[in-house]
Swiss-Prot record:
Belongs to the class-II aminoacyl-tRNA synthetase family. The keyword Ion transport does not apply. The gene is glyS. This is Glycine--tRNA ligase beta subunit. GO terms for cellular component: cytosol.
Amino acid sequence: MSEKTFLVEIGTEELPPKALRSLAESFAANFTAELDNAGLAHGTVQWFAAPRRLALKVANLAEAQPDREIEKRGPAIAQAFDAEGKPSKAAEGWARGCGITVDQAERLTTDKGEWLLYRAHVKGESTEALLPNMVATSLAKLPIPKLMRWGASDVHFVRPVHTVTLLLGDKVIPATILGIQSDRVIRGHRFMGEPEFTIDNADQYPEILRERGKVIADYEERKAKIKADAEEAARKIGGNADLSESLLEEVASLVEWPVVLTAKFEEKFLAVPSEALVYTMKGDQKYFPVYANDGKLLPNFIFVANIESKDPQQIISGNEKVVRPRLADAEFFFNTDRKKRLEDNLPRLQTVLFQQQLGTLRDKTDRIQALAGWIAEQIGADVNHATRAGLLSKCDLMTNMVFEFTDTQGVMGMHYARHDGEAEDVAVALNEQYQPRFAGDDLPSNPVACALAIADKMDTLAGIFGIGQHPKGDKDPFALRRAALGVLRIIVEKNLNLDLQTLTEEAVRLYGDKLTNANVVDDVIDFMLGRFRAWYQDEGYTVDTIQAVLARRPTRPADFDARMKAVSHFRTLDAAAALAAANKRVSNILAKSDEVLSDRVNASTLKEPEEIKLAMQVVVLRDKLEPYFAEGRYQDALVELAELREPVDAFFDKVMVMVDDKELRINRLTMLEKLRELFLRVADISLLQ
C-alpha cells in the first residue's frame, strides 16, 4: 500500500498568543487519535503554529485502511430456534443487525457449544474519504473556552477562518471545514513576501511558506531564533537578557517573522525600583529587560519586530517613544508615594473590603499583625519586627504605584519601608509575604518574613473556611490550595516548630464571632493534610506511604515530613513486607475482638517460648524507643522495629491467639495491641501494599 504526506493548514485571523501552543498540541493529539482509531498507518505527526495559522503535517500516511475480517457471534443454537426449528426473535434481531438473514449465518462449534456466526470481509475505506471528518472532529475538540462567530454564518471557532488547505500528496482533499471550502491556497505574511500563493505538494510545507510567504511556521524554530538573537543582542551591549520562558513563549506566538532589535530608555528612570520598570516592559510591552553582570538593570531593552524593515531605527525609535510615558508614570508614582510614610496608608485600608463577611483589609491587617507576632514567638523570630511587618503588610496596596502596576505589590512595600527607615527584615518581609507564589517558587528568606507569610495565608484559610466557602471542584477564587501548600512548604522546608492544630486555632480565635462554621479548625487541618497528599505524590512517594502517615493525622508539618521519610526508608528494608502484613493481621484480629484488654501484658500467664520472647522484645523496645519518638527520630525507630520480624513470624507460626482460656486470650491480644502501638507511633504500616 502506497504512502503519502498529508497537510492540513487552517488560516485564521490572529490567534490568542497565550493559547497558541496548547491549540496546536491539542490539534496534533486529537488528529493522531483519529488516525489511530481509524486504523490508518502513519509516520510522525508534526504540528506548526504561527499567529495566523494552525497546521499539521503527517508523514507516510497510508492511502486506505487495511481490509479486515470481522466475526460477530450470535445466540446459541438452543436459543436461536424454537422446537419447530423456526428462528427466534433473538436470532432474527441479531441477523438484522448484521445485515443478513438467519439462513445466511454460519455455525460456530466449540467444546462449549454451538452458536450462530456472521463472518465478513470488510474493505478498508480510502484515506481521502476519511480525512475531512477527522480534521473537523479534531478541530471541534480543541480546548477553546470562548468561541467566536463571524459574518452571517453559524460557524464557531477561536478566531475567524479564511483558508483551509488539505493536501494528500499533491491532491486537494475536497471538504468544507469551518465554513471554508478546502483548497491549495496559503496566505503569507501581511507585509512581506507573497500575500497569497498555491502549494503543489504537501511535502513543500513549511519551506514554501518561509520562502514565498516570509512566515516561519515552526513554533519551536521561531522561539529558538528569538532566544538566540536576543542573547546575542544583549551580549553586544554587555548585558544579559531576561528571557523568561512565559514571555518567550508569548512573543514567539505574536510574530511570524521575528526580527530582534535593541532599544534604550533614559538613565534617569533607573532611580525607580527596577521591578516597576520591568513590570511595564514585560507585562505591557512584551519587551525583554537587560541586566548587567552584577544584576543591575541596564537602560536598554530588547524587543521583537514582526517585519524586516529597510529602516529598523524607525521601529526602534517608535518603541522607545511608546515605553517612555509608561516609565515616566512609574517615576511619578514612585516620587509621589514617597511623600508620605507607608503606615499613613493604614486608614485607607478601612475603605477596602477583604470579604463581605470577614471585614475590610484593615481588619485583616489587625489579625495578621497579631498572628504574625504569635507565630514569631513560636519559631524564635523577632516578635516586634513580625508585628510591625504585619501592621504594614497591606499598606502598599493603597499606593499609586501598586494601583497602576498591580504585580508590584509586596516589592513596592519593601522599597517604601526602606525609604521610611524600617528594619531590613521588616522591609524584606513585606516583599516575601506572598511567597511561595507558585510551585517551585522561593520561600521567605528570614524568620520574620516566614512569620508574616504564614500569618497572611492562615488568616485567609481560617476566614474563608470559617464562612463555609471552601474550594469546590476547579473553583478556588481565594487560592486556598496555593495558600495551604505555601504554609506547609515554609514550615517543612524551614523546619519550623509549628503545629497546625494550635496555629489554626489561633487564626480562628482572632476572627472573634465572625465565623459561622463550627468545624472550621478541623476543616482547615483536613484540607491542609490533603495538600500533603498531592505534594508528596509529586515528590515521587507512593500513595500507600502517604496514606500510612495520614492515618496517624500528624499535625506538625515538619513531623509529618520526618514520618514520610522514615516510612519510605522502612520500605527498603528486607523485613518491611512481612511486618506490614503482620500489622495488617494484628489490626484485623484486634478489630474483630470485643474483649476489654489490659493496660499491660501479664508475663506470668504467658506459656509458649515464642510469645514470651516477643513480649520481652516489645517491652524492651517500648522503653528504648521512647526517646526516639520524642525527638522525631522515626527512621531510627523503624529500623529498630524491623528487628521484630523473626519473633513476630515465629509467634504467628506457633501461637494461637484466640484460645478458649479467656485470661490467656486477653493477655495475647494485649501483647499484640502493644506491638501495634509501637508501629503506630510512626505510621499505620498495615496500609503498605
